[in-house]
Amino acid sequence: MSAAVACLDYFAAECLVSMSAGAVVHRRPPDPEGAGGAAGSEVGAAPPESALPGPGPPGPASVPQLPQVPAPSPGAGGAAPHLLAASVWADLRGSSGEGSWENSGEAPRASSGFSDPIPCSVQTPCSELAPASGAAAVCAPESSSDAPAVPSAPAAPGAPAASGGFSGGALGAGPAPAADQAPRRRSVTPAAKRHQCPFPGCTKAYYKSSHLKSHQRTHTGERPFSCDWLDCDKKFTRSDELARHYRTHTGEKRFSCPLCPKQFSRSDHLTKHARRHPTYHPDMIEYRGRRRTPRIDPPLTSEVESSASGSGPGPAPSFTTCL
């Protein structure tokens, strides 16, 4: 008797476990017209579309098969009628679950694996397909399972985020120095003024000895360069001063302006005059000791038009050399 009671208790426990694992079939509310109300209340009817498993994570595949346990004796059934009712209810639920799968024409999903996930951008959003725990698996982009996921580095504050999910940390770095920059020129140290004036109280010094000799004549009052023009007894300490004075007698004007026909006897007078022209440039005038080639400006538009019409162009700029 004790073995039969233990068997019935075990059977009742199995029934309760199977009932808790199975799908619950709710009764549908009656339609407004009253038609089709009894069809949904039948125990063996197919469940509605809302009760069918969706494309999300699958639930239990099917109702597990009940263990084959010998039916209780009539005496035991009278002693425990609730066990008999539980067994009958479990049989009805098992048969109704199998009939629903056969009527719907869909094979139950295998509980060991997932089906192909539906892309989120095509069908429905991920929040409707799966809960928060499974949304990452369904909405993940199609990629190789062997390729490791590379986490993106956090973007620095203020740096623009690059397209594709990469951080813009590399953009915040300073610009690289140009590789083809011109090399720096060495600073030219000026030569020392070695020729100092020997007279007391005079601190002047010169690069050349000839310049020092000319300066010493200012202390001694010596004027070795005298003018040989008739009735002219002027004397000078420097030869260039004598040459400049001599032109006042001859009237020679060897310094001509490159922008106009004017001529001058002194180079400083020419420079002062040439600066008044708006198109003047220092390279237009050659002085003694200048090594650069003078720059010749292109002819003006008016001169080009006049030469094309047949008239001769204006006088070409002449370059002279100072003594």
From Swiss-Prot:
It holds the Pfam family zf-C2H2. GO terms for biological process: positive regulation of sphingolipid mediated signaling pathway; positive regulation of transcription by RNA polymerase II; regulation of transcription by RNA polymerase II. One of its GO terms (molecular function) is sequence-specific DNA binding. One of its GO terms (cellular component) is nucleus. CDD domains: KLF14_N (cd21576). PROSITE patterns: ZINC_FINGER_C2H2_1, ZINC_FINGER_C2H2_2. Residues 27-80, 94-116, 142-161, 166-195, 279-323 are annotated as: Disordered. Its main location: nucleus. It is found in: Nucleus. InterPro entries: Znf_C2H2_sf (IPR036236), Znf_C2H2_type (IPR013087). Transmembrane segments: none annotated. A zinc finger (C2H2-type) spans 195-224, 225-254, 255-282. Coiled coil: none annotated. It comes from the Eukaryota. Residues 40-53, 94-106 have a biased composition (Low complexity). Keywords: DNA-binding, Metal-binding, Nucleus, Repeat, Transcription, Transcription regulation, Zinc, Zinc-finger. Residues 54-73 have a biased composition (Pro residues). Residues 184-195 have a biased composition (Basic residues). Belongs to the Sp1 C2H2-type zinc-finger protein family. This is Krueppel-like factor 14. It comes from Homo sapiens (Human). The gene is KLF14.
